[in-house]
Amino acid sequence: MRLFYINYADLSVAYGATVCIVELAKALARQGHEVTVIVPQFKRNPLPPDGFDLLTIPNRDIRFLRKVWFYLASAFWVTLWALRKRPDILYWGEMTYTITPYLVSKLTGIPYAIIAHGFAPDELRVSRWRMAIVKWCQKVYFGNASVVVTVTPKIAERIHEVYGIPKEKLVPIENGVNLERFRPMDKFEARRQLGLPETGYIYIGWVGYFFPWSGVETLLEAAKKILAEFPNARFIIVGHGVWGTHLSDFAQSLGLKVHLMKPLNNAPSHLPSIPLPDPATWQVCFTGEVANELVPVFINSWDIATAPYPGGRNEKSGGSSMKIREYFGCGVPVVTTDVAGIGTRWLIGEVETERGRNGETESKVTIGERGVLTVPDDADAFAEGLLILIRDASLREQMGKNAREFAETHCSWDEVARQTVKAFEGVFRVERSGLRFK
């Protein structure tokens, strides 16, 4: 199969969306498919492609107009390249203010598919008239797509509910994880690489891009409660983003002893990420952006990994948690929140028991096969979930083993690629038969 995979993404920066693009492209290429990834040209050069071709569309670095320019330019460039290479299908990342995927398909006669990592009407905070434009554009390009891939069943439900897209056209395919990159390593060796003491502390971590819906505030509030009982607990927050400065200020407002390795916003920084300073001098360490190769080292250094997703937007349409899959790949137990839109209950596994220190948290904290679930937006419950694992090293070890086994069985990018190809093969059967979704 020959595939064009078009996204508005800066491949020089590693975060959830770019990881998904690169890893899926690599997995499809490994399975013998001819993949061309098409993205805008940003200031920093993207990482060299691994097994797939990369084309970049000239970009205009004008604030508020970058995406609009890409939408306009991609209509020309993708059409031109598609007429030359004649891919079997055009696979577009979800867009907002455009119907470019539909137009290019009409101009070239090539079927197209859309991948939705979220549901824009649930996420955007814009005026009524702008939202009307978004919904009209999405109704056009979702409605005329041959298939719509969503990273969670909840997103598929929302697209069906709002736009009436037939359910047979909606194909939920969860994200994966690179099991070679995210694999267990010796915990003490990981700590030595980061400059951390091997013993004497309980390390609890989070990794990701700082969005308002990441829930790091809940973790920070829980940290204050944990430190009251376990003063040797240390919290390592790996990442950066638009919400970064707010989070460091919030941690300090809680009275936590904070260390910043580098700025937490999106500004480039040449400051080193490691070695980390002596944990005796901090309780919460914000690392800022770290090199890709260091992310698995950080995760492997932790006793417990966290994903404190809030409800609200996540509960409604959610997304597919990359970080939990990465934690699982490294064999680290997870404390997360029970959010249907992200499918955390499925990830953590069948609940075996419930435990709480008092009546208030009794029904809010549950133990699964690969971690602990708590209700969202509740720092007391999240702290209790952490305490369960802090107190029980053998439980942490068993959950970590279960997590890695689950990742190997359910979370590989090769499996995601196979499911994606299967969805596209259905498109080709429909095209050849002359049928159309109604």
Functional labels for PLM-detected ranges:
Residues F4, P197-A223, I236:
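Conserved donor-binding/catalytic core segment of Leloir-type glycosyltransferases
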Residues F76-L83, I99, L103-L107, R130-T150:
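Membrane-proximal helix-turn-helix segments that form the acceptor-binding/catalytic region
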Residues W92-Y97, A116:
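Short His-centered aromatic/hydrophobic patch
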Residues I324, L347-A379, I388-A393:
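Conserved acidic donor-binding segment of nucleotide-sugar-dependent glycosyltransferases
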Residues W69-A73, T108-A113, P121-Y141, E161:
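Nucleotide-sugar donor phosphate/pyrophosphate-binding loop at the beta->alpha transition
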Residues E289-F298, A305-F328, V335-E350, E362:
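Nucleotide-sugar-dependent
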Residues K154, G176:
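Carbohydrate-associated surface elements
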Residues L247-P296, V351:
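Nucleotide-activated donor-binding/catalytic signature segment of Leloir-type glycosyltransferases, i.e.
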